[in-house]
Structure formats: structure tokens, C-alpha cells
From Swiss-Prot:
One Pfam family it belongs to: Pectinesterase
Organismal lineage: Eukaryota, Viridiplantae, Streptophyta, Embryophyta, Tracheophyta
Active site, UniProt feature: D169, D190
Binding, substrate: T116, R252, W254
Gene Ontology biological-process annotations: cell wall modification; pectin catabolic process
Name assigned to this protein: Putative pectinesterase 10
Site (Transition state stabilizer): Q168
Record's signal peptide: 1-28
Source species of the chain: Arabidopsis thaliana
Assigned EC number: 3.1.1.11
Pathway: Glycan metabolism; pectin degradation; 2-dehydro-3-deoxy-D-gluconate from pectin: step 1/5
InterPro entries documented for this protein: Pectin_lyas_fold, Pectin_lyase_fold/virulence, Pectinesterase_cat
GO molecular function: pectinesterase activity
Parts forming coiled coils: none
Amino acid sequence: MKGVTIHNFCYSYFKVCLLVMSLAYGSAEWDGSSSQIAKTIIVNPNDARYFKTVQSAIDSIPLQNQDWIRILISNGIYSEKVTIPRGKGYIYMQGGGIEKTIIAYGDHQLTNTSATFTSYPSNIIITGITFKNKYNIASSSSPTKPAVAAMMLGDKYAIIDSSFDGFQDTLYDDYGRHYYKRCVISGGIDFIFGGAQSIFEGCTLKLRVGIYPPNEVYGTITAQGRDSPTDKGGFVFKDCTVMGSGKALLGRAWKSYSRVIFYRSMFSDNILPIGWDAWKAKGQEGHITFVEFGCTGVGADTSKRVPWLTKASEKDVLQFTNLTFIDEEGWLSRLPIKF
């Protein structure tokens, strides 16, 4: 039998450490393939060996990166605005869970500049992290303004077991194909908005209308921005739960061909009977696709919904609820995590 060399021992020890850390950081797991995860870097402000901020870890990744690099973010509250710039794709951000790893800031005023977290490139994975915009959450005295927690602008994103916390315009899901699974999204006004092509599966949508600030009469969950009949965008909510405080619409049309589908989801009594608003597409209701199919709960009664609510068969709906809506070429199955 060969002796154990220092090199072999160190390499084996490193692999064991990574495995232990992977199991400790969220429920999505690394599949163990060194060919898929090329490098792991760590953020821990309390250890001089590692990066002190999330942004400094991202800054260390070379432009035009083509290999998956994992950023393990230690538990804690990170008070910083974080941006993944163009040309820095294939980043896997892994936190310790939504109650443990929190990136929070309080910028506000404009949707395109206020985000706590902004991601431009394609090929991004996020697990076990809360992105929070603190503006208007802890104070009822501030005027309501756009205050984005996260702005997603790239293609092929998988966001698992994460949280987006804010009040107005919490999640700016604007471009690309995105898969959100077991996420929590909180807010009061248009708190999931944009033009992306996304499936939200097993997610919890938490309303905080009437609390911060108290003068809001009712809120809106979605404001989807599909703007033409050929636009592939749309928000699909599959097996989700809507709950929280106050009353809200399921959505309002931000653009003329807005598309939102709720499938097999549970609505609490927070949902207003009318359900939806044509908003920016008034007079063009025939272009809007707002669907509720197989939903349950007190708020799922559609007898008093808007008369132009889309009538869809199960066959019609399944073309959107199937993962092929965002994943015709199988990119999700090629990701270096299991979820």
C-alpha cells in the first residue's frame, strides 16, 4: 500500500472541508463534480484569511469567466450594495439560509438604481440568501417610493431557498429565464415586477399592506411587463402560497401584453375579490393573459373577478407550468447543484 503524502492528505482534507461547508450552507447541494465547480472562495468578515465583503469576492473573479465559481457567504448581515457586472457569469452564491445570511441596504427613489443586489450576466445560481431593501419596512413615516431588493437582468438564473424582502418593487425580475424555488418574496406594491420569463415554484408571497406605511389602502403582488405578442416573458406561480397582512390584487398590467399565471396555488383572504387591474393596458384587456387555474383558499373564489380574466384549459396552462417554458434546452439539469 502506498504511503499517504502531504499533498494527498491536504487535497483530501480540502475536499472534506468543502463537503461539510456545502451541507451547512442551505439545502441545495454541490454534486461533487470538480469539473463543474472550478473554485470556491469564502466571505467571512471575521476571518482575515477570507474576503470581508460579498462585493470584494465578486470583484476577484476575472472578466469573461467561463467556469463555475462558488462564493460561500458566512452567516451574518452584510450592509452593502452588491453588483455582479457584465462578463462575470457562472457565479454560484451560497449562503447559510434566509435567516442567517442577509444582504441589506436602504437605497430608494429609482427602480434601476436602488437595488440592494443587481445581477447583469447570464448563468447565476443563488441559494440560502436574503436580499433586503430596508426602506419603508421599519418606518411608517417615510413616503412610499421604489426600493428594490434585487434586480435580475441576465439569462439562466436558478434561485433556490432564498428571500427577497421589501415594500414597493421588491423583486425587479426584468430579463431572461429564471427559476425560483422555495423562495419567500415580501412586499406591498408591485413587489414582483418586470419583463422576465420566470417560474416561481413552491414560493411564499407575503403581503405587508397596511403596516408599512399604513396609508396604503390595498397592494398589488405582480406588475408584469410583457410588451408584445411575440414576447416570451411571463410570470408563472406554481404551487405557491399567498399570505400576509392587508388586501391586494394578484396583479396589474404594467405593459400591454402582461402575462401572469397562478397554478395550484393557495390564496388567503388577503386577495381582493376583483383580483386584477388592467392598469397600463386599459382598453387592451384582450391582450392581457391573467390566469388562475386549480387554486385554493378563501381568496381563490373567482366569481367576482374582472370579466376579462383569461379562461384557459389545463392543456393551455401546462405549456407554461412545465419547466420547458424556461428550459427547452435543459440548462437547469446541467447546473452544478441539486435542488
